[in-house]
């Protein structure tokens, strides 16, 4: 029997953290963060990490599990999340994944199992490389590789290219999980306004001090490349004004939100929920309860 997993996804600033806590409290669950930046200690504000009060309201995993000097990959996330899901289930609780890093979540929950003769990190690195390509470039690669993909589905093309590259060492089997994807969204302008307001709140909460520490201590770290940090480095070097740096954070965050929505829409079988819609919480509760009772 497959393990049922609730997955709360969506663009930045849409309200994933609050919903995840609500569902964990309501359905006896524990939260696994599906965010590539929230693993880092001391990076709290720019990563929009759940506050100490929020983390006290529900058990959270994969937050503050790496120093900023360490790297973090999809392979590490998959290995650690699998162990956590098994542990949470063994204690009679519901695993709830909350986050916006689509590659990590898809790598965990889609039907890929890596055989013992291939480096798992190598496969995930190749997947990330393919994901950076446009639909047109992927289709060209598929044609050159002699792949016949029904409907030219992006997901199927990537899967086919992986199988072509790694052959029998990559087993194409069903996942051991049964996920319910809850993808939060909102009208674009409303979402963009929320993003802008959140950046302003981050600045008021001390984001610049957090960035300054990172810039002084670990400017070359993988963590420093995240949105909300890298945009301030030119300001700290005297190249742009603080206002320009803040505007760049807002602009990059809006662009990232758009890319996230495109990812979830095109590459994962998700149900969308408009957060500003009346009674949206009731719709989500109904979906979760029907999923758990099935």
Curated annotation (Swiss-Prot):
Gene for this chain: miaA
Subunit structure as annotated in this protein's UniProt entry: Monomer.
Region (Interaction with substrate tRNA): 35-38
Site (Interaction with substrate tRNA): 101, 127
Purpose: Catalyzes the transfer of a dimethylallyl group onto the adenine at position 37 in tRNAs that read codons beginning with uridine, leading to the formation of N6-(dimethylallyl)adenosine (i(6)A).
Biological process per Gene Ontology, one example term: tRNA modification
Catalytic activity field: adenosine(37) in tRNA + dimethylallyl diphosphate = N(6)-dimethylallyladenosine(37) in tRNA + diphosphate
Pfam family, one: IPPT
Binding site for ATP: 10-17
Keywords: ATP-binding, Magnesium, Nucleotide-binding, Transferase, tRNA processing
Record protein name field: tRNA dimethylallyltransferase
Top EC class, one word: transferase
Protein residues bound to substrate: 12-17
NCBIfam families recorded: miaA
Family the entry assigns: Belongs to the IPP transferase family.
One MF term in the entry's GO annotations: ATP binding
Listed EC numbers: 2.5.1.75
Named cofactor requirement(s): Mg(2+)
